């Protein structure tokens, strides 16, 4: 199995292809990407027969920006007979996966696939039973075994394969299913909520998103991101010349500072989180974020980088490299992750966590 399917946001196939080609090449896993515009997925075909498995084992999924999910697959199954689609799929997976922990029957996230998605949900139950009978799936779901993927690209046409549960997205189609809170000031609140799900392990939420923490929201108006911090019982400095939603001010947890987010400088040293969703050139935002991290003004940050029309992967890579270089220059060890989230549009979301600093300054987490 030498092909890897990568699910992505429709319209960003070229960026996804450029990224996987670059990062696979860095690990000497060479191949080429098959791209169809607005398809919502990319296929990276490796030159060596076992390199698909090697790629999804060795390249950290968390290092990918534009992929929502990935899995290794074999050849395309076509013209599945409507009276028995199950037998050919089981046949393709026997000998490839043994005692898998979960089945996901998926499609790309496109308007054209919505009808197909309804079929996939109905088809999952009988297919799961057949795969269990054949030993492809274990008799119970477990996160400790590979995930079996059946990916339909059209009626009667699918790829079959697997991913490793320790190196994939835990979400169906790579999309966290979040509900918009009725009392949130704007839909942008879902970006930050999704970022928490993607970047912070669930078993660390109580420690890293704790009650009573202090946070700063730069460019906060009307308060979509502040809402997520308030919901977690944090105290928030919301920085923006524009007004905040009265519902947030009424909580007593928000201090509204009428300032430019690029000029604001914190006066206290107990800030755990800084979040930022300002519409500005990505290089300018990256420079501001690096300044906050280098000066130890916050412990963790989540921010958005708005993407240009062209060379998006190159632009994001350049901005992340700049932040990394600034941290290295000042002896700061940090963890950097970036992802184009489901709720992002022409942007990517970045998470940086300071681990420790080799020079004097604020007390870091470890």
UniProtKB/Swiss-Prot annotation:
Record Pfam families: FtsJ, RlmM_FDX, RLMM_N
GO BP annotation list: methylation; rRNA processing
Function: Catalyzes the 2'-O-methylation at nucleotide C2498 in 23S rRNA.
Protein name: Ribosomal RNA large subunit methyltransferase M
Annotated GO CC locations: cytoplasm
Keywords: Cytoplasm, Methyltransferase, rRNA processing, S-adenosyl-L-methionine, Transferase
Transmembrane segment boundaries: none
One GO MF term: S-adenosylmethionine-dependent methyltransferase activity
Main subcellular location of this protein, as a coarse class: cytoplasm
InterPro entries: RlmM_FDX, RlmM_THUMP-like, RNA_MeTrfase_FtsJ_dom, rRNA_MeTrfase_M, SAM-dependent_MTases_sf
NCBIfam families, alphabetized: PRK11760.1
Family according to the record: Belongs to the class I-like SAM-binding methyltransferase superfamily. RNA methyltransferase RlmE family. RlmM subfamily.
Subunit description: Monomer.
Encoding gene (name): rlmM
Entry binding sites for S-adenosyl-L-methionine: 188, 221-224, 240, 260, 277
Reactions catalysed: cytidine(2498) in 23S rRNA + S-adenosyl-L-methionine = 2'-O-methylcytidine(2498) in 23S rRNA + S-adenosyl-L-homocysteine + H(+)
EC number of this enzyme: 2.1.1.186
Subcellular locations according to the entry: Cytoplasm
Location of the active site: 306
Top-level taxon of the source organism: Bacteria
């Amino acid at each position: 199995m030498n092909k890897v399917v990568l699910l992505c946001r429709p319209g960003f196939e070229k960026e996804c292809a450029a990224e996987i080609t670059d990062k696979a090449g860095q690990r000497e896993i060479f191949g080429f990407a098959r791209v169809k515009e607005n398809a919502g997925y990319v296929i990276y075909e490796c030159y060596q027969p076992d390199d698909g498995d090697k790629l999804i084992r060795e390249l950290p999924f968390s290092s990918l920006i534009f992929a929502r999910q990935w899995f290794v697959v074999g050849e395309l199954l076509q013209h599945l007979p409507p009276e028995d689609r199950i037998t050919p799929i089981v046949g393709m997976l026997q000998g490839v996966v043994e005692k898998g922990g979960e089945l996901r029957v998926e499609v790309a996230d496109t308007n054209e696939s919505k009808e197909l998605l309804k079929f996939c949900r109905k088809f999952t139950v009988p297919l799961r039973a057949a795969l269990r009978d054949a030993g492809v799936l274990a008799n119970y779901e477990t996160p400790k075994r590979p995930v079996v993927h059946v990916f339909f690209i059209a009626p009667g046409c699918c790829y079959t394969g697997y991913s490793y549960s320790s190196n994939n997205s835990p979400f169906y189609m790579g999309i966290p299913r979040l509900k918009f809170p009725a009392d949130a000031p704007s839909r942008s609140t879902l970006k930050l909520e999704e970022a928490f799900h993607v970047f912070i392990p669930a078993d660390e939420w109580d420690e890293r998103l704790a009650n009573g923490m202090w946070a700063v929201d730069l460019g906060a108006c009307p308060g979509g991101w502040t809402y997520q911090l308030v919901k977690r019982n944090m105290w928030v400095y919301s920085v923006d010349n524009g007004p905040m939603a009265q519902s947030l001010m009424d909580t007593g947890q928000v201090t509204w500072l009428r300032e430019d987010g690029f000029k604001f400088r914190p006066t206290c040293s107990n800030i755990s989180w800084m979040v930022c969703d300002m519409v500005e050139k990505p290089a300018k935002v990256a420079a501001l974020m690096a300044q906050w991290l280098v000066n130890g003004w916050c412990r963790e940050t989540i921010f958005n980088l708005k993407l240009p029309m062209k060379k998006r992967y190159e632009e994001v890579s350049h901005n992340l490299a700049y932040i990394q270089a600034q941290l290295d220059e000042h002896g700061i060890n940090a963890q950097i992750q970036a992802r184009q989230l489901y709720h992002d549009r022409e942007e990517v979301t970045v998470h940086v966590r300071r681990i420790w600093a080799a020079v004097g300054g604020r007390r870091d987490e470890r």
